Amino acid sequence: MNYGLNVNTLSTLFIRSCQQEENGIKQLEDKIQTLLDLIFDNTLPFSFEQSKDLLLKWKKEGYPAIHHSDTFNQLYHPSYRLIHKKYVPFLELFQYIDNNHPSMISIDGRCASGKTTLSNLLKLVYDCNVFKMDDFFLQPHQRTKERLESPGENVDHERFKEEILIPLSKHEDVKLRKFNCSTMSIEHAILIPYKPFNIIEGSYSMHSSLQKYYDFSVFLTVNKDEQIERLRKRNPKMLNNFIQRWIPLEEAYFNTFSIQDKCDIQIDTSKA
């Protein structure tokens, strides 16, 4: 399969995929137990005792990497690399970036669809800045009843445009002033040196007043059941707040302005 990826991008994906995950050992041992269960139930045609002994020996050795046998290498000359499955849904986006070198892209979409995860992955692969819409919540004086009832207006898109997008469009450094939800105030500015590639991440990043600044836009979606499950795992105490408030606000914005249709590509992360 040819995705037209730059060799440097492929190399970075290979390297990042080799890095040990935080729960890598636990995940491996869970899968080993599943394997043993299948063998014990005669679903797989292997000796249970022999398999258990071999896997226990592998564990005692610290789970060293498994290689093809010398016989297999001599017969088939295998030559391949693996990338982590978390990168697979986004290969089309990587391809676009490698072939078009955009200056600014937007990642909009449903909550718990993986917007932050994607922006973090892109930052690992490319030399870029990431600016988050979550740093631009409304200030207290902006939270009028009229504004909060208007689709897409529960974010400070005016300040985001003036302080982030306009400087970036002029190839200027950015003075990032995050909104602090704990103090309900704007923090002191942080100087972010300009980079040729910038990612704007978060719901409402495709607000009509911001769209013209992007070279490319991505919409991430997720099915309802998976969305709720991810939100439950992320913060069970806030789940009802998301269901009753934030999700309806997002959906009103998406539907009123046909955001999904206006994005260049749509990616469903339900099975990612």
Q: Could you tell me what each predicted segment is?
A:
Residues 118-119:
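Post-Walker A alpha-helix
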Residues 186-234:
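ATP-dependent NMP and nucleoside kinases share a basic, alpha-helical "lid"
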Residues 115:
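Conserved lysine of the Walker
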Residues 129-132, 138-191, 197-198:
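Conserved nucleotide-sensing/catalytic segment adjacent to the nucleotide-binding pocket
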